[in-house]
Amino acid sequence: SNLGQMLVKICKDDSVPLVNIVRKPEQVELLKSLGAEHVCNTNDPDFMKDLVKALIETGATLGFDATGGGNNGELPGQILSAMEMAANATAKEYSRYGSDTYKQVYIYGGLDRQPTLLKRAFGMSWGLGGWLLTPMIGKIGMERFQQMRERVASEIKTTFASKYVQEISFEEMLQPEIVK
């Protein structure tokens, strides 16, 4: 997705480790061509193993899911479980309640309308919730929001650029035969 491509660029620019999860081999190649280090394909037989390895290497304990399900509704739970496995791989002691590392997945889109399924293999220190831009802006305040807007404006042709198959004018957009 365009958002995934933007995330690769901004995280690389800001030295923030990022783990990307995609569904197709061509998406893996695209993100890697942009400089992504960790790209896991949900359709790969080693998906969970690759995801745990990437999470160990990055230390990531926060995830964002655009689908709200994916992988038959299991993707958010798979992410949490992989985070738990990564936390336990470096844990100093065992607890029957799981690691004490807090893991969070935010669903910010509803591309997959089927139920989100959680197979509880991620201990007791976790969260799953929704994420929307408008409430986040209220929490960070107008000054920080303005800084973010300025960054997007200054990087609109680079970091935040989108690729389109075709551009049409506003007048053309109003013609049903062109929009189809």
Explain the meaning of each model-derived region:
Residues 1-45:
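Mid-domain Rossmann-like dinucleotide-binding core that forms the NAD(H)/NADP(H) cofactor-binding site
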Residues 7, 51, 152:
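Aromatic/hydrophobic pocket-lining residues that form π-stacking "cages" and hydrophobic walls in ligand
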Residues 11, 31, 63, 79, ...:
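Terminal peptide-recognition signature
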Residues 22-26, 42-46, 67-70, 168-172:
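Short beta->alpha linker loops
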Residues 25, 46, 112, 132-137:
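Residue-level detector of flexible, active-site-proximal loop/helix-junction positions
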Residues 30, 126-139:
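A short, hydrophobic/aromatic-rich structural module that often spans a beta strand
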Residues 34, 38-129:
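Glycine-rich cofactor phosphate-binding loops and adjacent beta1-alpha1 units
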Residues 80, 86-91, 133-180:
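C-terminal hydrophobic helical "lid"/dimerization subdomain
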